[in-house]
Amino acid sequence: MNLILTLKRPFIWLSRIRHRCGYGVHSPFAFELITCLIYEKTPYYAYKELEAEEEKQKRNHGKGWKSESRKVTRLLFRLVNRVQPDTIVDAGVPSSSSLYLQSGKATADYTFASELSELFLEAGVPVDLLYIHKAKDPSFVEEVFRICAARSTQQSVFVIGGIHYSGAM
């Protein structure tokens, strides 16, 4: 049975390849998100400057600075650039993602919180973009999500990293 599946697998892949770029998606929003944001390969104007700044921050902060993958940081930059949020909340460990989130829209109010006690949000201000990346602490993720979900709008975007880290996530 394994041999048959092994022989069929390339043909299954070939039959599905036309849907790879989102052409099987019916929602216009999801189609644009897949084709123009996730699969985007064009280098943006700020990538080189951000990578240089990231290297400088790594040298200055040492082990207290988490370097995220280029793929994730660039996706976050493109997401902020596309959505143009007024309020960005970055909850988790200090990392290179903060540079990319802030430079996507320089005029946005940026809030970083590594602990719940640091999460200060003004009353009545909605959270337009939330990035949670502290997978080792599921209670922190749940509490930040609960706080920010109460302040979300229809245009709010939540990005949660490490959801497969543990069963509790």
PLM feature spans:
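A short alpha-helical cap/connector motif
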Residues: 1-129, 135-159, 163-169
